Amino acid sequence: MSSQTPVVTVDGPSGAGKGTLCMLLAKKLGFQLLDSGAIYRVLALAAIHHGVDTESEDALVPLATHLDVQFIAEGDLVKVILEGEDVSGELRKEETGMAASKVAALPRVREALLRRQRAFEAAPGLVADGRDMGTVVFPSAQAKIFLDASAEERANRRLKQLQDKGLDVRFADLLSEIQERDDRDRNRPVAPLRPAEDALVLDSTSMTIDEVVEKALQYIESKLAE
């Protein structure tokens, strides 16, 4: 068995179920959790809280370097704790999203956040949720999973989520949005969405979440025992 801190990466397209899988894996393994998709929103929110200009690299880099954030799996949700405060609700606000877009466009800030994400690698272990965790952020991770599902299945899942919230949405619109996002993610010049060469590819299209978790755990346990 390797003496290094165990790292499990889960990458994949939007709507494949990465968040749910990572939360359940972190709880079952007793590992820490990193939601890389939320990290830019967290930094943007920290900037807003501290009155820092979200377009100033010089001001944002030290904030990113020392970002005090935790992701805690609790019940069916992941709580985001920024500087000791639960900011899960604030992260979803439009103001935070707009600020995050500005922050994400700054190269030195991206580099600082890359280092900050790598600092999550600590005992007893880490489950990292994202799009380039196994290819860019943690290329030496012992267990890498690429969780996929058909665009149609992901649109169906999203449709059900939104309908459960009482929203009136069309399947065709959701499918189109997902296909466009897939195209952007897979063809972007920096860190395109793709499985790491040594990743287990899981297609969850016709699998239940319990089946996905079982397959993932079998794979992780075998990799960590090597």
From Swiss-Prot:
PANTHER family: CYTIDYLATE KINASE (PTHR21299:SF2), CYTIDYLATE KINASE/PANTOATE-BETA-ALANINE LIGASE (PTHR21299). Disulfide bonds: none annotated. Its EC number is 2.7.4.25. The lineage of its organism: Bacteria, Pseudomonadati, Pseudomonadota, Gammaproteobacteria, Vibrionales. Its main location: cytoplasm. It comes from the Bacteria. It is found in: Cytoplasm. InterPro entries: Cytidylate_kin, Cytidylate_kinase_dom, P-loop_NTPase. Belongs to the cytidylate kinase family. Type 1 subfamily. Pfam families: Cytidylate_kin. This is Cytidylate kinase. One of its GO terms (cellular component) is cytosol. Keywords: ATP-binding, Cytoplasm, Kinase, Nucleotide-binding, Transferase. HAMAP family: Cytidyl_kinase_type1 (MF_00238). GO terms for molecular function: ATP binding; CMP kinase activity; dCMP kinase activity. ATP binds at residues 12-20. SUPFAM superfamilies: P-loop containing nucleoside triphosphate hydrolases (SSF52540).
